[in-house]
A protein has these predicted regions:
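Class I (Rossmann-like) S-adenosyl-L-methionine-dependent methyltransferase catalytic domain
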Residues: 1-46, 57-104, 128, 145-215
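A short acidic, Gly/Pro-enriched loop at the edge of an enzyme's catalytic core
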Residues: 103-115
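A short beta-strand submotif of the Rossmann-like class I SAM-dependent methyltransferase core
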Residues: 117-120
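A short glycine-rich, Lys/Arg-flanked "PGG" loop and its adjoining helix->strand segment in the class I
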Residues: 130-142
Length: 215
């Protein structure tokens, strides 16, 4: 099972609504410490071109641009992209913005040294997650880095809501209505990452899994 267009649109509409208000954006303005921490590694690798996949209101795209990387940022939410555009212009930061989803990235093969996807690719089934990882693999250069988050089966919300596929549930709350979320344990994640070298795997009980992979 894959997410159909109607469900994807429901998710985009929910994020559009959140990003339209300062209150909705408030928790999504500061870069995550794990992303800040990888900056020295990216510089050590002489990474240049980077992709923020599911950029939201741009907290990480802007950080990467501040540190001199050539940043492409993509999101399905026009409201989120508008915030990134306005903030980048105000701060004099070059960020190339694209409207789109993770399932079919509008970029050529092997174009990025680093792909970041924070709280994005688990919106769907495990099949959707695998397809998105395939797209990320396609656009990463050899030895490029992927830093991403997924939901763990240890998450407090695992098993809550309507099961629509293995380890995939829809929670009928206002903010998540129509959003399938898939969950995986470490073994399932390693299986989905066939071809990648797993460099680090960390678990945050209150937030999400965050992992670093090399193509």
């Amino acid at each position: 099972m894959a997410i159909d267009g109607a469900v994807s649109q429901t998710a985009v509409e929910a994020w559009d609504k959140r990003w339209a208000t300062s209150e909705g954006r408030a928790d999504w303005l500061e870069p995550h410490p794990a992303v800040v921490a990888i900056l020295p590694e990216l510089h050590a690798r002489a990474a240049r071109r980077v992709l923020d996949l599911g950029c939201g209101v741009g907290r990480h795209a802007l950080l990467l641009a501040e540190h001199g990387f050539d940043v492409e940022a993509i999101d399905g939410s026009l409201a989120g992209l508008a915030v990134v555009r306005e903030t980048a212009a105000a701060r004099g930061l070059p960020v190339s913005l694209h409207k789109g989803l993770a399932d079919a990235l509008p970029f050529p093969d092997a174009g990025f040294d680093y792909v970041l996807s924070w709280n994005v690719i688990h919106h769907g089934t495990l099949g959707d997650l695998g397809r998105r990882l395939g797209e990320i693999w396609r656009v990463l250069r050899p030895a490029g880095l992927l830093q991403a988050t997924v939901l763990s089966t240890r998450d407090a919300n695992y098993g809550i809501g309507r099961a629509i596929a293995p380890d995939t549930f829809v929670i009928d709350q206002v903010e998540r209505k129509g959003h399938p979320h898939c969950y995986c344990d470490a073994a399932a994640l390693v299986g989905l990452l066939t071809g990648f070298d797993l460099l680090t795997l960390r678990y945050w009980a209150l937030k999400s899994d965050a992992s670093l992979y090399r193509r």
